[in-house]
Amino acid sequence: MEIIPAIDLLDGACVRLHQGDYDQVTRFSDDPVAQALSWQSQGAKRLHLVDLDGAKRGEPANDAAVRAIANALDIPVQLGGGVRSIERAEDLLNCGLERVILGTVAIEQPDLVQVLAERHPGSVVVGIDANKGKVATRGWLEQSDVLATDLARRFSDSGIAAIITTDIATDGTLAGPNLDALREMAQASSVPVIASGGIGCMADLLSLLPLEDQGVSGVIVGRALYDGRIDLAEAIGAIGDDRLQDITCGSTDLA
């Protein structure tokens, strides 16, 4: 299973929000390039970026940092947040990003997702951010009536590379992942599902392993890495693709 460190960008700095609340911001670093290089040096195989300003306003606000990170790293970089047009998505791919993540437009302009997936195979990911099972959009500031699982089914055969599913209720809380919601998403999707939200310790990461065979291929980790609750290199060794053995749910190693 792939462990993907997250860098959330707000006003050019690395931050984390609590349950997506822009009024509950924790600032971790003023140098996102140095932070990105640190995750790479610790063994990350991919980096996840979020333009929080872009997600909120619908227009890019951290492009200087995004481009600097893409140019500095040797590993693939993906970005979500405010990617709401073909032109914006292709600009990001042309500047060195491996993948773009489409969230709001997946609800509002589903045909755009299809077009981009056909033009750029393997480079388009759909981000499904859910609150009580229903999709939230525009930086989580608006709530739709669309079920997250229905949206996953809608794009399963569209040629996208993966679905990133974020449980808003647990995001930034360190309270553990919503395993039931993850299982439902994996069952609804025929493409790999990447989990996001709630990871607070190694036991949380290990709890995802039984879902790997059901289609959960990776996990995005943010606050737990910044707080030092999880060591990235250790986590990669425990649940990464090169791990020595699987650890079952009932194992005492989860303690």
Curated annotation (Swiss-Prot):
Which residue positions are annotated as catalytic?
D8, D129
What GO terms fall under cellular component here?
cytoplasm
User: So what does this thing catalyse?
Assistant: 1-(5-phospho-beta-D-ribosyl)-5-[(5-phospho-beta-D-ribosylamino)methylideneamino]imidazole-4-carboxamide = 5-[(5-phospho-1-deoxy-D-ribulos-1-ylimino)methylamino]-1-(5-phospho-beta-D-ribosyl)imidazole-4-carboxamide
Q: MF terms per GO, please?
A: 1-(5-phosphoribosyl)-5-[(5-phosphoribosylamino)methylideneamino]imidazole-4-carboxamide isomerase activity
Q: Which UniProt keywords apply?
A: Amino-acid biosynthesis, Cytoplasm, Histidine biosynthesis, Isomerase
Give, as in the UniProt entry, the pathway in which the protein acts.
Amino-acid biosynthesis; L-histidine biosynthesis; L-histidine from 5-phospho-alpha-D-ribose 1-diphosphate: step 4/9
Mind telling me which InterPro entries this protein's record contains? Aldolase_TIM, His_biosynth, HisA_bact_arch, Isoase_HisA-like, Isoase_HisA-like_bact, RibuloseP-bd_barrel
Where does this one sit in the cell?
Cytoplasm
> What EC number(s) does this enzyme carry?
5.3.1.16
UniProt keyword annotation of Cytoplasm present: yes
The record, for Pfam families, names: His_biosynth (PF00977)
Q: Name one GO biological process term.
A: L-histidine biosynthetic process
The UniProt family comment states:
Belongs to the HisA/HisF family.
Q: Which PANTHER family match?
A: 1-(5-PHOSPHORIBOSYL)-5-[(5-PHOSPHORIBOSYLAMINO)METHYLIDENEAMINO] IMIDAZOLE-4-CARBOXAMIDE ISOMERASE (PTHR43090:SF2)
Designated name of the protein = 1-(5-phosphoribosyl)-5-[(5-phosphoribosylamino)methylideneamino] imidazole-4-carboxamide isomerase
Q: Which organism is it from?
A: Synechococcus sp. (strain CC9902)
